[in-house]
Structure formats: C-alpha cells, structure tokens
Regions:
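Fold-level recognition of mixed alpha/beta catalytic cores in primary-metabolism enzymes, strongest
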Residues: 134-225, 233, 237
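A conserved active-site cap/scaffold subdomain adjacent to cofactor or substrate pockets
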Residues: 254-330, 334
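Active-site metal-coordination/substrate-binding segment of hydrolases
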Residues: 65-156, 162-163, 198-201, 314-317, ...
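Zn-dependent metallopeptidase/amidohydrolase metal-coordination segment
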Residues: 9-12, 336, 343-358, 363, ...
Length: 483
C-alpha cells in the first residue's frame, strides 16, 4: 500500500505520490517531463515537449463548453532539493518518501516538493477525470523555475491559444495572487591567494536555523547562516585571535534562506580562551537577536587536526571576512502602497570556496525595477571594492497588478460561492512565472492560487491535506464556470 492511499482527493494524491517517486530537482526534470509526455499519449492528448523539457498539453472542451473561453493551467516541474544533515538521499537521483503526519503530508528528511508538484498533480488529475466539465484546456508545465524561471523564459508559446491563465504556485489558501516581484541572480567572485600555514584546523558550524523561502518568508526576521559567519570572524578579530581561512560553505540554493554554514580556520594553537570568549559572545548575541525566530541557533567548534595547510593569506582572509560582514541581505524596503508587502530584498543563499576564489550567490527581488537595479549596483560596487567581480543572470520581470481582469472576477465569484466570504487579493514578493508569461503573450489574463503549503524549500515542508481537497473543489468550480 502506498503512503498516501486513502487520502482525498484520491486522484490528486495518487499523481502527487507518482511525482514524488521521480527525481525532479532543478536541472533534473527530464524523467518527470517524460512521464507527463507518456501520460498525455496514454490519454490521447496533444503534447509538445521542447528541448529543455517544458511541456504544453492540450485537452478539448467537454460537451457544452465548446464556446467558452479556453483556460491555461500552469505550474512548474522542478523542486528545491534540500535535506537534513543526516539524510542519506541524493535528491538528484533518489525518490522522495512522502508520509502522512496528522493532517499534513511531509517527506522523510527532505523537502516535499509540494512547490510545485501539487500543481502538476492537480493538472494531471483534471486531465485524467471523466466527470469534470471544462472549456478547452492547455496545461503549461515548465522546468528550472526555482533557479531563475529559466524554463518559462526560454519556452516558445507560438501555439498557445488561451488568454486566461491559472497559475497554481501560491501557498496560502484564500489568497488570490494578482502581482509579484521581479528578480535577478547575482554571483560575487572574490579572488583569493593561498599560502602554507601551520597550526590547528578548527571548523565552526552555524546550525539550527529555520531557513525558508526567500520570497515568501524573507520578512519573518530569520537569521542568515552565511551572513553570521561574517559576525563570527569579526568577533575573533576583535578578540585578538590570529587565524587564516581554510574552507567556506553554506546554503543550498540562492532562493532559500540558508539554515547552515561553516568556515574552517587555521589557528596557531587551536581553541584558545580568546576563541572560547568569542564563541560565548557570539552565542549571547544570537540568542538576544534571534531567540524568537531561530530558537535553536547554535555555533559548534570542532578541532580537525594539526599540520601544514594551504590556507588563505592574511589579505584574502580579511577580504573574505569583510564580504561576509558587509554584504546586504534580507528585507531592504517595504511597499509604501501595499501594507505588509516586501518591496525589495536580497538573499545571500550560497557560499563556497575553491583554490582560486570565494563565491557568494544572491537572489535579488523587487516590485520596483529601479530599486532592483540599485541593489544590484550596490552588491557589484561592494564586490569591486573588495577586489572581486560579479555575474548577473536569471533576470525576470515583475508581474504588474491589472486593474481589470475577467479571470480575477471569475475566481472571486467562485470563491465567494464556495467559501461564503471574499478572498484576499494580494501581490507577493516571491517571483512567479506570470510575469514572464504576461510579457511574452499579449493580452494574457493571469491569477495565481494554491493550497496551504508550510515551510517550503526546507525539510520541514508540509502540505495541508484538507486545504488540498478544498482547493481541488475550487479549481473544479473555476473550470466549470460559465460566463
């Protein structure tokens, strides 16, 4: 018996479990894309798969809906692959193991992939059903959404006929998203020089942070494990500790708030009283600043042996410290027009170092194009002042709120009929593919919604089973709506 047997809606959870069984992290969606192609063929549906793995599946209108405007259902095939430190799975090759925990579906030691596997499951369940009335449907499933919306940016929509698009990539039931931020990825490259250094290697691990989605959870005041390394190194400097940087790592993806990081230093005499004093000071500061948002935050020190090491020279070590300390991160500005909406932010999501350079990877977001450009300029200028350079990629536009929208009006009317109350109409700080699609398809009318998903992009991710069922009924009602 499968782990999700007995859950309703049965078809949705059947396909979601099928999706979990096929590895589909970003850049590794081919198997899932091929699965969907075979699904379309088995159901006699027209399907186009491009070189990247993006899909367009078409289904004709059911009887009585032939004259209704067509609808596009849209989601993405890829997921963020993150796991706990003790999880043995390779998410590029291994299946996710979903389990039921009370009223939720979660995964054993990994991200669940509800973002956006639930959209794919909804779409396949609709296409598979014989009893759901709907107009002509076009299902658009993209790849590499989580790494800069690359699939949507590259996909050619020459044969897309519909002009009303339902994106199922929002994570709060009752919220109809009608606008989102634009974004860009930034890589900061800092050249380093290594020299022979003799001493004791000491690894410092920042662990126990909550992490989270850098779009939807950036405003929650959570610590950034990579940025905290700059605080740690600065405390050592202030305490008169002599050290040379040996290794650096942190984070998993640019768009995930890093929950763990580490820096390995070569110290002349190991963990001295000065090091312990700095560690105690660090722990006290972190508890005072992040005790509510990250109650389990912790710094662990581990001696890793004595000897001669190829470590960073003094200049490179201090430039690395300054970069980790000074690089901006987190919320930079709140919207002056929409209460509670983050306008501009950046997330320092990944840190790594090889023999020649240290690399810091950011995800920058803003609903104001000029603010996005200014923040990119600041990061570039600071990097150049520290002797490095930057590379920009993955730029995508904001999705601007439309004052008039027939699709939004439909979704509001259906919501009021089903729930007995008005939905919240909102813009979101996370990037959605609606911005790219609206820019490429003239006259496209978009809306985004989805069931309750908690702690996305982390191993604590979970999908609310009852919410998945309610949103399924809501989606079916939208499909069955007649103007």
């Amino acid at each position: 018996m499968s782990a999700l047997t007995g859950l309703e809606p049965a078809s949705v959870f059947h396909y979601f479990e099928e999706i979990c069984g096929i590895p589909h992290t970003s850049h590794h969606e081919k198997a899932l894309s091929d699965y969907c192609v075979q699904f379309a063929k088995a159901h006699g549906l027209a399907c186009r798969q491009d070189e990247m793995g993006n899909l367009l599946i078409k289904a004709p209108a059911t009887p009585g809906y032939e004259k209704e405007p067509g609808l596009i259902l849209q989601g993405h095939l890829d997921m963020v692959g993150d796991k706990t430190a003790d999880c043995p799975l390779d998410l590029e090759k291994d299946a996710i193991h979903p389990v039921v925990d009370g009223g939720y579906v979660c995964a054993e030691g990994t991200t669940l992939g509800g973002d956006d596997g639930i959209a794919v499951a909804y779409a396949l369940a609709v296409l598979d059903a014989k009893d759901i009335p709907h107009p002509a449907l076009e299902v658009v499933l993209t790849v590499c959404e989580e790494v800069g919306l690359l699939g949507a940016s590259a996909m050619d929509f020459f044969d897309l006929e519909g002009r009303m698009l339902v994106n199922i990539d929002s994570e709060e039931e009752g919220v109809l998203t009608a606008g989102c931020a634009g974004g860009r990825r930034v890589e900061c490259h800092l050249p380093i020089a290594r020299v022979p250094v003799t001493g004791t290697a000491v690894k410092a691990d920042v662990i126990g942070l909550v992490g989270g989605h850098s779009g939807t959870e950036i405003h929650k005041g959570r610590a950034n494990a990579i940025a905290l390394l700059g605080r740690w190194l600065t405390l050592l400097t202030e305490n008169g500790v002599d050290y040379a940087a040996l290794a650096l790592s942190g984070g998993a993806k640019e768009n995930v708030i890093p929950k763990e990081s580490s820096v390995t230093l070569v110290l002349p005499t190991g963990i001295t009283e000065g090091v312990r004093a700095a560690a105690a000071q660090f722990a006290a500061q972190m508890k005072a600043e992040y005790g509510t948002a990250d109650p389990e935050i912790c710094l662990q020190l581990t001696e890793q042996g004595c000897g001669a090491f190829s470590a960073l020279d003094a200049d490179s070590t201090q430039r690395l410290r300054k970069a980790l300390l000074l690089m901006p991160w987190g919320v930079q500005a709140m919207s002056m027009d929409v209460p509670g909406l983050v306008e501009t932010s950046l997330n320092l999501g990944v840190a790594e170092m090889d023999e020649q350079e240290a690399i810091l990877r950011f995800s920058i977001r803003s609903s104001v194009p000029s603010a996005k450009e200014l923040l990119c300029c600041k990061v570039q200028t600071l990097t150049e002042l520290l002797g490095g350079g930057v590379r920009f990629h993955g730029d995508y536009p904001a999705w601007t709120y439309a004052r008039e929208s027939a699709l939004r009006d439909r979704c509001v009317a259906v919501y009021e009929a089903q729930y007995g109350e008005k939905p919240q109409i909102a813009a979101m700080h996370a990037g959605l593919e609606c911005g790219i699609l609206s820019g490429k398809i003239e006259g496209l009318d978009c809306i985004s919604f989805g069931p309750n998903l908690l702690h996305v992009h982390t191993p604590n991710e979970r999908a609310d089973i009852a919410s998945v069922a309610r949103v399924w009924e809501y989606l079916k009602a939208i499909l069955a709506y007649k103007a």
